């Protein structure tokens, strides 16, 4: 794969202001109607939405790394922290250049991770950064023994499988329609179709009345590529979860490398290998 970050269907849809507005309203309980109220950028794999310079919404939506993971890993949190710190640093630099004496206010961060789970998975789980802290033996009589961890990040993990989190879906029709697209492909695969066949069938039978229909169909070739990438990565992730040796993980890494749709970043996140380790595996693969 190459190093260029590949887009996802979720970001393809929700970087469009007409679809981002109802998403913002669904998460914040607001009723914004003017697209100029929000500013959308994409950083790393995140959809970053700044709402009137007061609130920063960071949304990460993906199929992989969620459905069969027994516990969240570091990647659940680090992209959120990196994106928020980058945004704050940029805003502070802008404001300081205008008035260095004024105390800067920070935008309230709203962090969400969405995933296409199953109907049996919980609608919502709360992921905490402190769950990843390495336990330490602390003297209970010391100051550290009397206080909890001083740095905490909580990220709601929302299952957007069809029929779940209906309150969100009722407010944001594009989110419901996105979820239905993913579920439709999964259903076709369960019937025995290949991933590509399932994607094509979903696109051929998609409801023309859906708000995202025109955007999906106008970029159909790109949508097919994005969905095929996401489903392939999800499949790699499920196989990787069952890999009980380093050798098996390396073999999966090699399979991803020969897939032109897989980037180094995707391989890193899915396997846990560093970039140097991936390049080393790649060199051995090419020297054969």
Enumerate the language-model features and the residues they cover.
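Short, charged alpha-helical interaction segments and adjacent helix-coil junctions
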Residues: 4, 8, 27, 56-75, ...
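Accessory alpha/beta interaction modules
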Residues: 1-168
């Amino acid at each position: 794969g190459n190093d260029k970050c590949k887009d996802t269907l979720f970001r393809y849809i929700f970087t469009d202001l007409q679809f981002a507005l109802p998403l913002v309203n669904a998460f914040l309980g607001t009723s914004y109607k003017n697209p100029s109220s929000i500013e959308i950028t994409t950083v790393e794999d995140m959809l970053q939405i700044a709402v009137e310079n007061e609130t920063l919404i960071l949304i990460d939506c993906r199929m992989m790394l969620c459905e069969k993971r027994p516990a969240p890993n570091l990647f659940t949190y680090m992209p959120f922290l990196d994106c928020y710190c980058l945004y704050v640093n940029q805003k502070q630099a802008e404001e300081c250049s205008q008035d260095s004496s004024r105390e800067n206010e920070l935008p309230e961060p709203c962090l969400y991770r969405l995933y296409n789970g199953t109907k049996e998975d919980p609608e919502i789980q709360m992921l905490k950064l402190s769950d990843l802290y390495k336990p330490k033996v602390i003297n209970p009589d010391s100051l550290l023994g009397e206080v909890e961890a001083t740095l905490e990040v909580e990220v709601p993990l929302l299952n957007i499988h069809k029929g779940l989190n209906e309150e969100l879906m009722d407010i944001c029709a594009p989110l419901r329609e996105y979820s239905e697209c993913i579920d439709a492909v999964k259903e076709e695969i369960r019937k025995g179709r290949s991933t590509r066949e399932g994607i094509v069938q979903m696109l051929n039978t998609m409801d023309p009345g859906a708000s995202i229909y025109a955007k999906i169909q106008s970029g159909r070739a790109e949508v097919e590529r994005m969905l095929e990438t996401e489903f392939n990565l999800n499949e790699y992730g499920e196989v990787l979860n069952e890999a009980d040796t380093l050798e098996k993980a390396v073999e999966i890494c090699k399979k991803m490398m020969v897939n032109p749709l897989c980037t180094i970043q995707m391989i890193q996140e899915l396997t846990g290998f560093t970039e140097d380790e991936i390049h080393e595996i790649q060199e051995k693969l090419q020297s054969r």
